[in-house]
């Protein structure tokens, strides 16, 4: 899955996405995580799972 697709999916789940300097800041019901900003690249599965776990979406 591309990072841009994952970002759109997170936003559809209600995650607030804000731009950082070299990354995206993710917030969901008081939980926070970050994601590198490379929209054309594939997101690695361990990183995707870690972000979901940190946000409580897994």
UniProtKB/Swiss-Prot annotation:
Q: What keywords are assigned to this protein?
A: Endonuclease, Hydrolase, Nuclease, RNA-binding, Stress response, Toxin-antitoxin system
GO CC, one annotated term? toxin-antitoxin complex
- Record EC number: 3.1.-.-
Checking Pfam families in the record gives:
HicA_toxin
Enzyme class, first EC level, given as a word: hydrolase
GO MF annotation: an example: RNA endonuclease activity
This entry's comment on induction and repression of expression is: Induced by amino acid starvation, carbon starvation and when translation is blocked. Induction no longer occurs in the absence of Lon protease suggesting, by homology to other toxin-antitoxin systems, that it may degrade the HicB antitoxin. A member of the hicA-hicB operon.
Picking any one GO biological process from the record gives: regulation of DNA-templated transcription
Q: Which residues cross the membrane?
A: none
Q: Looking at the keywords, is DNA damage present?
A: no
Q: Outline what the protein does.
A: Toxic component of a type II toxin-antitoxin (TA) system. A probable translation-independent mRNA interferase. Overexpression causes cessation of cell growth and inhibits cell proliferation via inhibition of translation; this blockage is overcome (after 90 minutes) by subsequent expression of antitoxin HicB. Overexpression causes cleavage of a number of mRNAs and tmRNA, in a translation-independent fashion, suggesting this is an mRNA interferase.
UniProt family annotation:
Belongs to the HicA mRNA interferase family.
Q: How does it assemble?
A: Probably forms a complex with the antitoxin HicB which inhibits the mRNA interferase activity.
Tell me the protein's name: Probable mRNA interferase toxin HicA
